[in-house]
């Protein structure tokens, strides 16, 4: 498939994923302070310009997830670098989404991963070496390496714990944007159901 055809297919997949996410009111409960992005990389992507994402990220408007902009190439930094690094360990990973992490959500996601035969992982940011944290661009390779060493492969779902000035976050990795959003919205609906029961 030509690169142009791939690019159009990816933008279409991302637009569909975004539409699905914006229709899931429950996902607003998983919105982190840093907001959410969904990314989808071209095969063999080596730079952020080869990764499509939601321009301006996704926030909450009137109780629903809402994109600040449209899917665009080069619209993400952090999540784009994460996907590019993750692909060094698994070529099947093309897309990702981030969302809020706390102890209650961790329990739900662990069970969801177990029930769906997904590999669950976590990163202990307190173990990150000072020289790695201080050097631009060094954290991402270290984080992905930690995940692979701990899980013996790249996890499907993982969280980053607290770090200095860092918000804990979950990340789902998958073959395309639609599939990672499907998992995220399923988790959001389970989370909402549990919160309603305990209210």
Q: Which stretches of residues belong to each language-model region?
A:
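Conserved mixed alpha/beta catalytic, RNA-binding, or beta-rich assembly cores of soluble enzyme
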Residues: 1-199
């Amino acid at each position: 498939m030509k690169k142009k055809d791939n690019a159009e297919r990816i933008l279409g997949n991302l637009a569909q994923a975004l539409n699905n996410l914006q229709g899931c009111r429950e996902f607003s409960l998983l919105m982190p302070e840093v907001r959410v992005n969904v990314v989808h990389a071209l095969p063999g992507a080596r730079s952020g310009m080869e990764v499509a994402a939601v321009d301006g990220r996704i926030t909450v408007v009137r109780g629903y997830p809402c994109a600040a902009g449209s899917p665009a190439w080069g619209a993400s930094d952090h999540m784009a670098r994460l996907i590019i690094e993750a692909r060094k360990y698994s070529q099947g990973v093309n897309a990702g989404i981030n969302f809020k992490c706390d102890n209650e959500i961790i329990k739900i996601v662990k069970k969801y991963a177990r029930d769906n035969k997904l590999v669950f992982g976590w990163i202990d940011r307190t173990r990150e070496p000072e020289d790695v944290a201080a050097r631009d661009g060094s954290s991402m390779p270290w984080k992905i390496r930690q995940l692979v060493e701990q899980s013996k492969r790249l996890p499907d779902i993982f969280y980053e714990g607290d770090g200095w000035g860092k918000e804990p976050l979950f990340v789902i990795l998958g073959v395309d944007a639609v599939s990672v959003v499907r998992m995220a919205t399923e988790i959001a609906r389970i989370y909402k159901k549990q919160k309603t029961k305990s209210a």
